[in-house]
């Protein structure tokens, strides 16, 4: 019976030894995996610093670009207002020209008889003058 006890203790010792060996291998494998994870995280940390720097630079450039666009937009607004002023001036000029043309047209209509008389008298004067020139020529 003691032999069974010794055999049982020996079997327990062997089982414990096997357990310790496999546990040791597992822990070494875990240690290697954790070292790989640590080196990967260090590389990732370096990449994140680079990305953070680039992101900050990009954000600054974007802000400068937005400010530049804002300034140019304000300048363009002044140009648009100036063009609107020119458009209003041209419209007023057109209105004045239409009124002047209307006044001239009304004046011509009112004085049509007088204009016809002036044209008739002018033609008569021209005919008299032409005849006088011809008489003068024939007299020479």
UniProtKB/Swiss-Prot annotation:
Membrane topology: Single-pass membrane protein
Keywords, alphabetical: Coiled coil, Membrane, Transmembrane, Transmembrane helix
Domain of life: Bacteria
Entry GO terms, CC: membrane
Keyword Coiled coil annotated: yes
Segments traversing the membrane: 1-21
Compartments, as annotated in UniProt: Membrane
Keyword field contains Cytoplasm: no
InterPro entries xref list: UPF0478
Pfam family, one: DUF948
Stretches of the chain forming a coiled coil according to its record: 25-77
Family in the record: Belongs to the UPF0478 family.
Name recorded for this polypeptide: UPF0478 protein YtxG
Species name: Bacillus subtilis (strain 168)
């Amino acid at each position: 019976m003691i032999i069974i006890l010794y055999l049982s203790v020996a079997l327990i010792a062997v089982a414990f030894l096997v357990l310790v060996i496999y546990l040791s291998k597992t822990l070494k494998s875990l240690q290697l995996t954790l070292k790989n994870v640590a080196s990967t995280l260090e590389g990732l940390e370096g990449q994140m610093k680079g990305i953070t720097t680039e992101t900050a630079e990009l954000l600054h450039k974007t802000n400068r670009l937005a400010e530049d666009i804002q300034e140019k937009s304000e300048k363009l607004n002044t140009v648009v207002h100036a063009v609107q002023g020119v458009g209003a001036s041209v419209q007023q000029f057109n209105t004045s020209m239409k009124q002047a043309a209307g006044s001239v047209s009304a004046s011509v209509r009112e004085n049509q008889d007088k204009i016809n008389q002036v044209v008739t008298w002018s033609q008569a004067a021209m005919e008299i003058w032409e005849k006088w020139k011809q008489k003068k020529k024939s007299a020479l």
